[in-house]
């Protein structure tokens, strides 16, 4: 199956019309993964036997005509727990962890008939922007295998971009869906905080984490978000709002839509080619009937320090549970209880995770709480207010997703501050709990450029409508990478 030339709807039609069976489709998917992933290394574990068993059962009962996702495979980021299937968060700490329950999003995907293909590589505990922090392997960018795929959902993006699956799930705490989507030339959506249940997502920063879909097209993305959204009694932060059909009205266009472009998102560090691509996108939206104005989000410049204080503080609390006693990695030949704690955590966690735990613990300490964590929380409120003020007059915000295109493997891994600045344009969206989308908007030296659309809370439908209009007016999403070739 050539996933570059198909979408969810076309494959569903083929399955309903019995051009091929679900089992044949699933076998073809695994055959392709085994060929392509030798170079990309997006998957940490495949679930072939159970996937084929489920495919056969769907063939026996017949593919549901009213469920577009029925019988189609999906890849899952390895911090989303999957019953009886190893879930590691790409950490030595959880190397052999087999959950006894499913994340809520997994139950929802199963209800929709989707087939879990396998678990995807990521930065350890979702801490990173390049997928180089994985304890197990480094995933490559299909457009240039010497480049990173972004992170932390690098495996999720690379698997879709390289045609191994049509859709995947990732998580986004500070840009971890949108930045890899931009680096790989695909569509990635971070939903509104509370739109999708976090139950079963291995926690990084609980006030920021959100699960979302990565796909090749905007409409496919909306279809997957339809399936995973909704209130969940297991997650007290999940919204009880009714979930609309995100595909409804997606083709209505942007005529009359008011779009804001923040001047702060084109500052120092934004590549010239990236800025030009986004400004070209502005012209496209204007030609489609939208009104586009420059505005200011003055407190966004504080986003990176605010984020790394809050996220690291929450991480230091969430990761206390990995102590060498309850579950997870336990150091060998320990001498006493203190040795169990110290050595298990020292040996089980990677450098970046330990760095953030230390930063968070410091920020929460008695002598630093007021100066750091409390102050960061106050500035976070100002960032939220900036967005609220803009949305009084505008329907959508348009900006670059990442300041640059994908950089080389090994180029920034030893410079944490430079690495952290990769998220400067995506972090404010998480701090404000807003929905954000990255979609393809051009190329620079053969590498994809991402356009970011940011909507008001629970206005994903507006974001999808604008994204679809742009996608249909351009050909960037149709570009197919040449694996191992010249792009």
UniProtKB/Swiss-Prot annotation:
A GO molecular-function annotation: glutaminyl-tRNA synthase (glutamine-hydrolyzing) activity
Keyword field: ATP-binding, Ligase, Nucleotide-binding, Protein biosynthesis
E.C. code: 6.3.5.7
Single Gene Ontology BP annotation: translation
Organism superkingdom: Bacteria
Catalysed reactions, as listed in the record: L-glutamyl-tRNA(Gln) + L-glutamine + ATP + H2O = L-glutaminyl-tRNA(Gln) + L-glutamate + ADP + phosphate + H(+)
Pfam families: Amidase
Cellular component annotations (GO), alphabetically ordered: glutamyl-tRNA(Gln) amidotransferase complex
Enzyme class: ligase
Residues forming the catalytic site: 77, 152, 176
Homology family: Belongs to the amidase family. GatA subfamily.
Quaternary structure annotation from Swiss-Prot or TrEMBL: Heterotrimer of A, B and C subunits.
Function: Allows the formation of correctly charged Gln-tRNA(Gln) through the transamidation of misacylated Glu-tRNA(Gln) in organisms which lack glutaminyl-tRNA synthetase. The reaction takes place in the presence of glutamine and ATP through an activated gamma-phospho-Glu-tRNA(Gln).
Name of the protein in its database record: Glutamyl-tRNA(Gln) amidotransferase subunit A
Gene encoding the protein: gatA
